Amino acid sequence: MRLPSIATLFHPLQSFSIRGGIHPETHKHLTSECEIETMPMPALIRLPLQQHIGAEAEPIVKRDDLVLKGQLIAKARGPLSANIHAPTSGRVIAVGHFVAPHASGLPVPTITIRPDGEDKWGPHLPRLRPENAAPEEIAAQVAAAGIVGMGGATFPSAVKLNLRAKYDLTTLIINGAECEPYLTCDDRLMRERAEEIADGIGIMARALGVKQVFVAIESNKPQAIEAMTRYNRALGYTFKIHVVPTQYPMGSEKHLVKMITGQETPARALTADLGVVVHNIATAHAVHLAVRYGEPLIARTVTVSGHGIRRPANLRVLIGTPVSEIIAHCGGFTEEPDRLLLGGPMMGMPIQNPRVPVVKGTNGILALTAAETPEAKTMPCIRCGRCVQGCPVGLTPFELNARIHAGDLEGAAKVGLMDCLACGCCSYNCPANLPLVQSFQFAKGKLSERQSRKHQQEETKRLAAARKAREEAIAEAKKQMMLKRKAEMAAKKKAEEAAAAAAMPPPATATAIQGEATP
């Protein structure tokens, strides 16, 4: 079938302005023309039980169990959690702890599988026909497949798909902005799998019951724009391809909503309050595979880049594959990297141990050289305001930083500390090279710690008060019981005395006695 040209399908849409933002060097040329290739089977697969926002999954396998590809090995613990499946067939060699793919490097509960090389599938999830499926069925299938937000947030996707029960939803926005420097995995996915992505978008739109769908793509991805424009229809929906400016952090959920709809999401509110739900491009692709083919989320596309990587690439990688094996597949390091990151350079997570695994939210592995991360001497703040100009939330980072360093964390919270996205725009703009984001993250952690401690203290007081109230109630109940028993005993005694008195013969009268005495 001959597809219509992009000129007949694509029309620029109205965009609304957003505040702040920066334009860092993108470095996307390193991998933008690298087609997605399949990463070979790793020697070991390590699956942390918490690859998502919410409660960690509960393991349902044990050491030495044989598992099949796609088999459920850890089940969601409650609605805000996610299932985890075996990415290939093999043997479970450990259900214990391993280093987290996190800057802390702390051990976390992990299932380790040694692949058997057969890559043998177990039973798939039941396939659905989304044209006839109820919204609840689609959401349940997405939950069963363990799908989470694959742009990095890792929020369980089924929870979002069920929002129609609580909110009046009108709009679905698919986030294909991919604004982080270096990363091109979503770009390549749109260029190579546009038809499958479109189907996933249609499935999600049907589940949400929205009236309109936008696909947001940055202007520096013309081939992706063309591909998605050609496949802009599915399940009765026609998607509007919205080309957004190449600007960081354009991929931020609330900024996309403002750019496309003109609506400002209030602080601590949800975009669903405005009738809008945002999902990632890769999430749409995972939904397509889960609903149409019954495949759980066991693999994802990852960009491997940076001048420290000998052969930058876009790879289709099994979840749980060690970063070290991926780097080796890409030819190893060109030199010892100055920074090794999971994710992008702005919001990515530095790691010390390359043996950590790729998880569901891992969209990039970056090995940055010293030339890419130049160290600059920090100087005192000159209150130039460049951090304010860059902040997409409209905060005053220099004031936040001053309050934090003065120990006034509550004061920093009052001027918006908890609204910080940790996007890094302020640090990027700062001529004094101050580590603003690190300062804000530290302060947010301290505040959260204080609030947690305060909550624990209040909970302890509440429990103590409740215990005291229970003890007083028990004591009062005992007192009342004793009083009641005493009253009952007194009444019983009185009744017995009355009965005894009634049973005695009446005393003889004087007249009667005299009469008895007369001869």
UniProtKB/Swiss-Prot annotation:
<keyword id="KW-0479">Metal-binding</keyword>
<keyword id="KW-0472">Membrane</keyword>
<dbReference type="InterPro" id="IPR011538">
    <property type="entry name" value="Nuo51_FMN-bd"/>
</dbReference>
<comment type="subunit">
    <text>The complex is composed of six subunits: RnfA, RnfB, RnfC, RnfD, RnfE and RnfG.</text>
</comment>
<dbReference type="GO" id="GO:0009399">
    <property type="term" value="P:nitrogen fixation"/>
</dbReference>
<feature type="binding site">
    <location>
        <position position="426"/>
    </location>
    <ligand>
        <name>[4Fe-4S] cluster 2</name>
    </ligand>
</feature>
<feature type="binding site">
    <location>
        <position position="387"/>
    </location>
    <ligand>
        <name>[4Fe-4S] cluster 1</name>
    </ligand>
</feature>
<feature type="binding site">
    <location>
        <position position="391"/>
    </location>
    <ligand>
        <name>[4Fe-4S] cluster 2</name>
    </ligand>
</feature>
<dbReference type="InterPro" id="IPR017896">
    <property type="entry name" value="4Fe4S_Fe-S-bd"/>
</dbReference>
<dbReference type="InterPro" id="IPR017900">
    <property type="entry name" value="4Fe4S_Fe_S_CS"/>
</dbReference>
<dbReference type="Pfam" id="PF13375">
    <property type="entry name" value="RnfC_N"/>
</dbReference>
<protein>
    <recommendedName>
        <fullName>Ion-translocating oxidoreductase complex subunit C</fullName>
        <ecNumber>7.-.-.-</ecNumber>
    </recommendedName>
</protein>
<dbReference type="InterPro" id="IPR019554">
    <property type="entry name" value="Soluble_ligand-bd"/>
</dbReference>
<dbReference type="GO" id="GO:0042717">
    <property type="term" value="C:plasma membrane-derived chromatophore membrane"/>
</dbReference>
<keyword id="KW-0249">Electron transport</keyword>
<feature type="binding site">
    <location>
        <position position="423"/>
    </location>
    <ligand>
        <name>[4Fe-4S] cluster 2</name>
    </ligand>
</feature>
<keyword id="KW-0408">Iron</keyword>
<dbReference type="GO" id="GO:0022900">
    <property type="term" value="P:electron transport chain"/>
</dbReference>
<comment type="similarity">
    <text>Belongs to the 4Fe4S bacterial-type ferredoxin family. RnfC subfamily.</text>
</comment>
<keyword id="KW-0813">Transport</keyword>
<keyword id="KW-0004">4Fe-4S</keyword>
<dbReference type="GO" id="GO:0051539">
    <property type="term" value="F:4 iron, 4 sulfur cluster binding"/>
</dbReference>
<dbReference type="GO" id="GO:0046872">
    <property type="term" value="F:metal ion binding"/>
</dbReference>
<dbReference type="GO" id="GO:0009055">
    <property type="term" value="F:electron transfer activity"/>
</dbReference>
<dbReference type="Pfam" id="PF12838">
    <property type="entry name" value="Fer4_7"/>
</dbReference>
<dbReference type="InterPro" id="IPR037225">
    <property type="entry name" value="Nuo51_FMN-bd_sf"/>
</dbReference>
<keyword id="KW-0677">Repeat</keyword>
<dbReference type="InterPro" id="IPR010208">
    <property type="entry name" value="Ion_transpt_RnfC/RsxC"/>
</dbReference>
<feature type="domain" description="4Fe-4S ferredoxin-type 2">
    <location>
        <begin position="411"/>
        <end position="440"/>
    </location>
</feature>
<feature type="region of interest" description="Disordered">
    <location>
        <begin position="494"/>
        <end position="519"/>
    </location>
</feature>
<feature type="binding site">
    <location>
        <position position="430"/>
    </location>
    <ligand>
        <name>[4Fe-4S] cluster 1</name>
    </ligand>
</feature>
<keyword id="KW-1278">Translocase</keyword>
<feature type="binding site">
    <location>
        <position position="381"/>
    </location>
    <ligand>
        <name>[4Fe-4S] cluster 1</name>
    </ligand>
</feature>
<dbReference type="GO" id="GO:0005886">
    <property type="term" value="C:plasma membrane"/>
</dbReference>
<dbReference type="Pfam" id="PF01512">
    <property type="entry name" value="Complex1_51K"/>
</dbReference>
<keyword id="KW-0411">Iron-sulfur</keyword>
<dbReference type="InterPro" id="IPR026902">
    <property type="entry name" value="RnfC_N"/>
</dbReference>
<keyword id="KW-0535">Nitrogen fixation</keyword>
<feature type="domain" description="4Fe-4S ferredoxin-type 1">
    <location>
        <begin position="372"/>
        <end position="401"/>
    </location>
</feature>
<dbReference type="Pfam" id="PF10531">
    <property type="entry name" value="SLBB"/>
</dbReference>
<feature type="binding site">
    <location>
        <position position="420"/>
    </location>
    <ligand>
        <name>[4Fe-4S] cluster 2</name>
    </ligand>
</feature>
<comment type="function">
    <text>Part of a membrane-bound complex that couples electron transfer with translocation of ions across the membrane. Required for nitrogen fixation. Involved in electron transfer to nitrogenase.</text>
</comment>
